[in-house]
UniProtKB/Swiss-Prot annotation:
The name this protein goes by in its record: Mitochondrial dynamics protein MID51
Entry membrane topology: Single-pass membrane protein
Sorted UniProt keywords: Membrane, Mitochondrion, Mitochondrion outer membrane, Nucleotide-binding, Phosphoprotein, Transmembrane, Transmembrane helix
Cytoplasmic-facing ranges: 48-468
GO cellular component terms given for this protein: mitochondrial outer membrane; mitochondrion
Parts of the chain that traverse the membrane: 30-47
Known partners and oligomeric status: Homodimer.
Family membership: Belongs to the MID49/MID51 family.
Organism: Danio rerio (Zebrafish)
Binding positions for ADP per the UniProt entry: 188, 190, 202, 344, 346, 372
Record's keyword annotation contains Nucleotidyltransferase: no
Region (Disordered) location: 56-123
Cross-referenced InterPro entries: Mab-21_HhH/H2TH-like, MAB21L/cGLR, MID49/MID51, MID51-like_C
Region (Important for interaction with DNM1L), start-end ranges: 161-170, 235-244
Length: 468
């Protein structure tokens, strides 16, 4: 505010702009609360800065700050590439986040009433905010119905294609390797949880391995020298009594541990190398081919001219303590940690989300599907996965109780702010295991790019919904 008042003293011919700005800012705190006033102040000062430049010397370049640095009125990220987030911007983001309202209560009518009781005028800004909130609400629901929701017919056809692939693999594996200790394979993923968005294009084929309880045990990643929560080692036990070869899966053991990479290689030789997919595809009227390269074993199934389904083949271990481990490597350290199995929280996270929605008829699942669609349709946000988005909602649910359908716009904005905060901190805890950092497989540059994109969207959230 001082910056505004100081500039005002030296400008007598600004046609009352300074007076108007001073009046708006002096009353903003009463009407909008501390957070709203801070954001209004930043925006107003930026506008006034441009206005002052236009009045001063339009033909001359803007003078640089004597210190060689831009002032906070000119954020260092203005005009920079959207793919680069420098240190100055991080500081701006951190400072701005601290001034953002922490809850929607800052914008509720009672805040306006308190302002009126202190002598403030009925705020046009409050009415405009309500209109904007209503507009965002309408856009979110329109986006949900028009872009997010998948027609039931498309989902049904995709599920049938996935089931056909599952049946072929089951028959082949039982015929080729009848002694391989496997439980019944099954299909899983968002296609079967009604959480898939935009197109029905992905499914997971879970392949549960049977391990002898007295021969194998899991060691949490945080208890190893690697110290990676969310992953586990599966160690071979009792080798002195049951030597190598006593378990079918000893052939996939590396350094005394069951290697998910070796397990995947066994299945890859069978699924990608031994099965005659062109012949099977001609019978099923599909075009089937293995995806190469891929971090997991994936099949691409073209079941219609313009529709493709990707089926991930995921070996699964269900340990004695109930922990589910899948053969999906660490994204950034697959070579260094090739013996690590990934702990899967998807089933428990989805169940928790649905239980919360059932308790209060909430819109958490709707929020999740909208965010998933936004990330799927915006390449700059593609690195945010379903687990991160689900946990952002679960974490916010611990602080915010109103998840009614009418609060969709407010919760959506809170989620954007929460995601920016997690990215700025470089950490998002998993609600089912607080030791797990769900951002640990993102590079610093990716975190910066995601944070930049979401931070820019805070001032224009509808831009996230304007996709091709």
């Amino acid at each position: 505010m001082a910056g505004v008042n100081g500039d005002r003293k030296g400008k007598k011919d600004d046609n009352g702009l300074g007076t108007a700005i001073d009046f708006v800012l002096s009353n903003a705190k009463l009407v909008l609360g501390v957070g709203g006033a801070a954001m209004l102040g930043i925006a107003t000062l930026a506008v006034k800065r441009m206005y002052d430049r236009a009045l001063s010397a339009p033909s001359s370049p803007t003078k640089a700050d004597p210190s060689g640095r831009r002032s906070w009125e000119e954020p260092s990220w203005l005009g920079s590439s959207p793919r680069t987030l420098n240190h100055d911007m991080k500081q701006n983001v951190s400072r701005s986040l601290q001034t953002l309202p922490t809850s929607s209560s800052s914008f509720k009518p009672d805040s306006l009433h308190r302002g009126l009781a202190r002598g403030g005028r009925p705020a046009k800004a409050e009415l405009q905010r309500a209109r904007l909130r209503l507009s965002l609400q309408e856009h979110l629901w329109a986006f949900f119905h028009e872009r997010v929701t998948i027609p039931s017919e498309e989902q049904s056809v995709a599920r049938r294609a996935a089931l056909d692939i599952c049946a072929e693999l089951r028959v082949f594996l039982h015929a080729k390797l009848p002694d391989m200790p496997l439980r019944e394979m099954y299909l899983s993923g968002s296609l079967y949880d009604d959480l898939q968005v935009v197109t029905a294009d992905h499914a997971q084929l879970m392949v549960p391995l049977i391990l002898e309880k007295n021969l194998w045990s899991s060691i949490p990643g945080e208890d190893t020298i690697m110290n990676i929560p969310g992953f586990s080692l599966v160690r071979r036990e009792n080798l002195e009594y049951f030597p190598r070869g006593s378990s079918y899966w000893d052939r996939c053991m590396v350094g005394g541990y069951l290697s998910p990479k070796s397990v995947l290689e066994v299945f890859e030789k069978l699924v990608a190398g031994s099965i005659n997919w062109p012949a099977i595809g001609s019978v099923l009227d599909y075009v089937i081919r293995p995806v190469v390269p891929s971090e997991t074993l994936t099949l691409e199934v073209q079941y219609e001219t313009d529709r493709r389904l990707y089926v991930d083949f995921l070996p699964l271990l269900v340990m004695e303590d109930g922990v589910s481990l899948i053969a999906k490597p660490h994204r950034l350290a697959a070579e260094r940690h090739e013996n690590l199995w990934r702990q899967s929280f998807r089933v428990a996270e989805t169940a928790k989300l649905r239980a919360l929605d059932q308790e209060d008829a909430g819109c958490r699942s709707v929020c999740l599907k909208i965010l998933k669609a936004v990330c799927k349709l915006n390449p700059a946000l593609a690195r945010l996965n379903a687990s991160q988005l689900t946990n952002a909602i679960l974490l916010l649910s611990e602080q915010e109780g109103d998840w009614t359908q009418e609060a969709l716009a407010d919760r959506f904005m809170q989620l954007l702010r929460a995601l920016v905060g997690h990215l700025e901190a470089g950490r998002m805890p998993c609600t089912l295991n607080l030791k797990v950092n769900l951002l640990c497989e993102l590079t610093p540059q990716e975190i910066d790019e995601l944070g930049y994109t979401l931070y820019c969207a805070l001032s224009d959230p509808e831009s996230l919904l304007r996709t091709v």
